[in-house]
Amino acid sequence: MTILKKKKKGSPQITPDERYRELDSHAQNESEIQEDVPISRKIANFLKLAYNEIRENISIYLLIIVYLCVCVMNKLLAKRTLKKIGNYSFVTSETHNCICMVVFFALYFMFGRRVMSAKERHRNFGVQFLLISLLDACSVIIAFIGLTRTTGNIQSFVMQLSIPINMFFCFLILRYRYHLFNYVGAFIIVVTIAVVEFMLSFETQEENSIVFNLVLIASLIPLSFSNMTREIVFKKYKINILRLNAVVSFFQIFTSCLMLPMYTLPFLKQINLPFSEIGTNIKNGFRCLFLGQNTIVENCGLGMSKMCDDCEGAWKTFIAYSFFNICDNLITSFIIEKFSTMTYTIVSCIQGPAIAIAYYFKFLAGDAVMQPRMLDFVTLFGYLFGSIIYRIGNIILEKKRMMEAGNDDDSEGELTNADSIITH
């Protein structure tokens, strides 16, 4: 029996991975930064890291830009649609759900069925689809009530609270773990928007109620659970995005009916609808949307009990809104599938300042064009700075996971060598 310092035949030779060499170089750079080095060297190292981050994730950043453009157009066209046919919300909601269902099912049968996973092919996801639809419906209904006495500035701030709410539930249910920079980045985004919206609140005299503000905040909870359910279905069962959106749209045709009794609530002001008038409202809504016929033209307008109809060409605005909303749903599902609920939450929060800036351009906003405000750019800067800090936290966590994986591989290699050095 002899002792040889060599491995068994067939055992793969373990060589350092290029990724870990790069990580070692990063670690050396970090140790250099901690020493007395010129400011220019620190800036150069930071710019190099930023360049590598953008180069390695260029597709992600392009997707974010596309998603941002789609979101801005979706929100602008939603407001234009509301201005034209705001008296018939139920009709527009149900018609939009039907359009989404037809489009998603058509796309699924043309492209989606060819790439079905084995788990998706042998499992029925009706319960998960229904759960997502019910959670979305609950979120819409609760938000519908909260929005009635929540001013526009407070609405914008409440939407940003989805960041800490999603972080909490993802930590609790999906077992996410965060770096300190994740918390700091999220905190910067929320505080920046809170300060700006607090300053803007002094410029408005609209009615606002703290109780309804809390109701609006509560609507973010079912929305968070809906997104987490999507993430679980996507990542655990590899379900097709088109199939999920198609079936969810089908269920939403029925869950939207849950909103009908909400229109009878007396505090809904201009959109209040007595129960006895629901049938007439639905009929007039179809006439407005498809025939362009105005019904409510007298005793209506700003400060009155009803909005005035502006049905001419309403179907064009509505179709454009439906198109961008469908694109929004597809990109949202793709981000949640490929990345995570928190990635989508952080990305979606840029909508607020981006939409505010979009209202500066008449060709986008139409009659709702606004004058530029410095506070909107401050909000955008705060969001971008907070997002960069949040992303740095993710990079650090990814680096730690890679280092741990490298250590595990090295320890396995040492055990293999120890077993193989004793040979005959």
From Swiss-Prot:
GO molecular function: xenobiotic transmembrane transporter activity
Entry membrane topology: Multi-pass membrane protein
Pfam family, one: CRT-like
Signal peptide location: none
Ranges of Basic and acidic residues composition bias in the record: 16-29
Transmembrane segments: 58-78, 90-110, 125-145, 154-174, 180-200, 209-229, 247-267, 317-337, 346-366, 377-397
Ranges per topology, Vacuolar: 79-89, 146-153, 201-208, 268-316, 367-376
Effect the entry attributes to changing F275V: Decreases chloroquine transport with no significant effect on amodiaquine transport
Result after altering L242P: Increases amodiaquine transport with no significant effect on chloroquine transport
Any one of the GO CC terms: vacuolar membrane
Protein's cellular compartments: Vacuole membrane
Glycosylated residues, chain numbering: N87
Biased composition (Basic residues): 1-10
GO BP annotation list: amino acid transport
Variant or mutagenesis effect after changing L384F: Increases amodiaquine transport with no significant effect on chloroquine transport
General function of this protein: Nutrient transporter. Involved in maintaining the osmotic homeostasis of the digestive vacuole.
Protein name in the entry: Chloroquine resistance transporter
